[in-house]
Amino acid sequence: MQCAQYTASRCRSCQWLDKPYPQQLADKQNHLENLLSDHRVTQWLSPLFGQESAFRNKAKMVVSGSVERPLLGMLHRDGTPVDLCECPLYPTSFAPVFAVLKTFIARAGLTPYNVARKRGELKFLLLTESTYSGELMLRFVLRSQTKLSQLQAALPWLQQQLPQLAVISVNIQPVHMAILEGEQEMPLTEQQALPEIFNQVPLFIRPQSFFQTNPQVAASLYATARQWVRELKIDSMWDLFCGVGGFGLHCADTETRLTGIEISAEAIACARQSADQLGLKNVTFAALDSTQFATAETQVPQLVLVNPPRRGIGAQLCEYLSQMAPQFILYSSCNAETMAKDISLLADYRIERVQLFDMFPHTAHYEVLSLLIKC
């Protein structure tokens, strides 16, 4: 993959861009195998990967420059703005959208936020595309509601220029910190969820719900989890840290008793919408803390699926899972180091199967799926 900003040393987000892609995969696989070297793994599966470029479905753009000539991208360490509208990680459909958004910022008078001066209103633009429909979700992250009426007044022009904009919202992030979004979200369109489909499973993306940024590899990850779980012939499972329900909805059939737990109410609303559309009747989704939910339950499912954030599931949940002793644990991780630590705490389980999914080409990061079986 070629990138002008990387070549000019203006952006180094893709730390491994100079490394041939086959070597990237080999290095990630070696890293994973070294982390699990103290454990016996019955079956290592080959890494799964997708496109090397144009694979992201989401752009997080810092807005800088002036209201007349806004710049979308990132800020260099010295505060210099870097335009990322031509970033090769984004699909080609994004560049013309960014061009229209720059014009819209000027028309609406949305003054870009100046970090050094702590002045201005528009901090970020967050753009997400559905690979299923081609529709877009756009979020304006503002410092306050000062420019909200101006934005709303100019919005019909933007919608005319970009009819694929299905979901538009404003997020208020008032603090002068490197935080992407605040708690307050205000919808500007009647439609509030972006539809997506992976492997014939309908999924929905709301403004404040997490969704994987590499749809091609994410679909493969979900399909693999479904295959592994279906082979186990289970009839009850928990999906902890379930997000919008991608894993559980793939793994469950009409007879499976599925309980999905996620702290984000927005994500749970998406999961419930998907379950309704699939006609699943034995499914429950709840907006709760996954660890608190699990440790308060007395019934034991046959399988517990966990997909935690980078910190892992932690000692408390590991201890409880060991006591609860479900027959199977399916662990999906975006941080193999914390996963390895967690697995070490699950001493009564053996690792049946492991597979790496390269969700983040040109970086050291990757996803990994591990199936654990009670000894």
From Swiss-Prot:
Q: Where is the active site?
A: 334 (nucleophile)
**Residues reported to bind [4Fe-4S] cluster:** 3, 11, 14, 87
Catalysed reaction(s) here are:
uridine(747) in 23S rRNA + S-adenosyl-L-methionine = 5-methyluridine(747) in 23S rRNA + S-adenosyl-L-homocysteine + H(+)
Under Enzyme Commission nomenclature, its number is 2.1.1.189
The UniProt keyword set, sorted, is:
4Fe-4S, Iron, Iron-sulfur, Metal-binding, Methyltransferase, rRNA processing, S-adenosyl-L-methionine, Transferase
List residues binding S-adenosyl-L-methionine: 212, 241, 262, 307
- Cite a single GO BP annotation: rRNA base methylation
Pfam families given for it?
A: tRNA_U5-meth_tr
Picking any one GO molecular function of the record gives: iron ion binding
Return the broad EC class: transferase
Does Electron transport appear among the keywords? no
Task: Give the NCBIfam families listed for this entry.
Answer: meth_trns_rumB, rumA
Q: What does this protein do?
A: Catalyzes the formation of 5-methyl-uridine at position 747 (m5U747) in 23S rRNA.
Tell me which family the UniProt entry assigns to this protein: Belongs to the class I-like SAM-binding methyltransferase superfamily. RNA M5U methyltransferase family. RlmC subfamily.
- Please state what the protein is called: 23S rRNA (uracil(747)-C(5))-methyltransferase RlmC
Give the organism, scientific name. Yersinia enterocolitica serotype O:8 / biotype 1B (strain NCTC 13174 / 8081)
Taxonomy of the source species: Bacteria, Pseudomonadati, Pseudomonadota, Gammaproteobacteria, Enterobacterales
